[in-house]
């Protein structure tokens, strides 16, 4: 997380120029992540993906300007972290290759376990930095407010309302319909997202129809959980439309 602002279980962000000679750590720093992904979804996917290499005890990510497209994954031991770094280096997450390094400093969770007395020192240092930043910000002049408003384009409210009502009336189904999928997003990318939810069966792309796919689960209930967890999700700048598929009559 951002070492200047985070006050809970923070780790220091390593420089992108760090090399493999960096000191190994239980905490991995990941960058080049798709920035449009919802934070809750990103954490779930990273926990699921890295969890296949061992116990993940924390996943840290923020939407602040400094931390966009980045995250930290904390393992319970160094061996698992090293295997994950080696195997997942360059792994295409949401169509973008992950760039993974050891974090320059250990997470608070690891420090608490190995050297509890250091935690209070860390907290004091962060508090001092936050207070200094506040004092510095107070000296900066406020940006002038805009004096004009941009015209709001007209919307076809009737058509939008009709479409929304029709989708809301669809009963729960173990199969989800995905629409507005970017061309570069394939079945493997969608699988990475939706297999994080219990009961996942498969992703089926629709041949000859771009931007559409189906995701099947074991039950209506599990599909509902996945639908709620991915509503509003964006990939490569496109907001993905997730609804229940129509049941065969």
Swiss-Prot record:
| InterPro entries listed in its UniProt record | Nucleotide-bd_a/b_plait_sf, RBD_domain_sf, RRM_dom
Q: Which GO terms describe its cellular component?
A: nucleolus; nucleus; U1 snRNP; U2-type prespliceosome
Region (Disordered) location? 1-25, 113-157
State any GO BP term from the record. mRNA splicing, via spliceosome
- Transcription keyword on record: no
Instruction: Please give the PROSITE patterns that the UniProt record associates with this protein.
Output: RRM
Statement: the UniProt record of this protein carries the keyword Secreted:
no
Swiss-Prot/TrEMBL keywords: mRNA processing, mRNA splicing, Nucleus, Repeat, Ribonucleoprotein, RNA-binding, Spliceosome
Domain annotation RRM: ranges: 26-105, 174-247
The Basic and acidic residues compositionally biased stretches are: 114-134
Instruction: Output the Pfam families linked to this UniProt entry.
Output: RRM_1
What this protein is reported to do is described as: Involved in nuclear mRNA splicing.
Protein family (similarity comment): Belongs to the RRM U1 A/B'' family.
Q: Subunit notes for this chain? A: Component of the spliceosome where it is associated with snRNP U1.
- Which protein is depicted? U1 small nuclear ribonucleoprotein usp102
